[in-house]
């Protein structure tokens, strides 16, 4: 089977194209990766042409021998559907998780996204956690959530609570909350480690003044996380733009009732009363 005909690949192309159509991927903004199963990799093996090993510059032994579909550095999500072999590539890690090699794609001399450290450290974290594996890591630049990082305190508790209050799906879609990382130089080990640490607790990490990382079980789930958190941020931005701000909102006790009736666990630290608000 051709790589571009494989189900996992078509789902990635759709995610990239949908994200671009939402306006989340200006120019070459954003990146995407999918941790492949052995079966998924075998389905496309007739087209695999392993290249030379390239040092990662760090070690992820938890992912030794694993293959990934990844967007390329400098590539445009706008081109995902029309130039998939150029936009994406498949890479494989060696038996120590210290080197990678290109297996397919990245036409015209391309290479993996510059945010590969953050993707791999996030995948390493998610692969080690119990439950259904979150194999898709998605980074985008949604305008409203970025705008909020200029006006809200850069706090997990503040962002989570404000976003949960906007509409009921938010605490149901991301009941564990939202992590917030301060502004850091993108593409480096420091921001990768900070994101990986937050991904131990969250599936959505906001990069202040930059964008969002989401980790989902599949491309649909990853897109759904990004879509939900950005819609909530859009509503909040509109509320904050109204003179006088909020006149009423969802109270902690209402969120607790939602938690009980829908069977989700909302951490109590996000439900503490805000100044001037009665439960």
Label each region the model flagged:
Residues 1-279:
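Glycine-rich flexible loops
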């Amino acid at each position: 089977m051709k790589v571009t005909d494989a189900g996992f690949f078509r789902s990635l192309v759709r995610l990239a194209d949908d994200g671009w159509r939402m306006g989340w991927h200006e120019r070459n903004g954003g990146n995407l990766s999918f941790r492949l199963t052995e079966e998924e990799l075998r389905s496309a093996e007739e087209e695999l042409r392993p290249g030379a090993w390239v040092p990662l510059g760090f070690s992820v032994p938890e992912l030794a021998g694993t293959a990934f579909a990844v967007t390329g550095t400098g590539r445009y999500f706008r081109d995902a559907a029309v130039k998939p072999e150029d936009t994406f590539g498949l890479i494989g890690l060696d038996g120590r998780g210290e080197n990678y090699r290109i297996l397919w794609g990245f036409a015209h001399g391309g290479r993996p996204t510059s945010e590969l450290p953050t993707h791999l450290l996030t995948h390493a974290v998610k692969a080690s956690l119990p439950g259904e594996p979150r194999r898709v890591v998605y980074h985008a630049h949604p305008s409203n959530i970025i705008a909020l990082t200029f006006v809200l305190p850069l706090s997990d508790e503040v962002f989570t609570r404000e976003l949960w209050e906007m509409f009921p799906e938010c605490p149901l879609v991301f009941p564990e909350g939202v992590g917030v990382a301060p502004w850091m130089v993108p593409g480096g080990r420091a921001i990768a480690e900070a994101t990986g640490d937050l991904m131990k607790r969250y599936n959505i990490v906001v990069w202040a003044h930059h964008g969002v990382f989401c980790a989902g079980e599949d491309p649909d789930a990853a897109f759904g996380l990004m879509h939900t958190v950005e819609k909530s941020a859009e509503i909040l931005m509109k509320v904050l733009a109204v003179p006088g701000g909020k006149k009423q909102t969802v109270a902690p006790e209402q969120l607790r009732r939602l938690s009980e009736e829908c069977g989700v666990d909302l951490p109590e630290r996000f439900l503490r009363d805000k100044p001037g608000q009665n439960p």
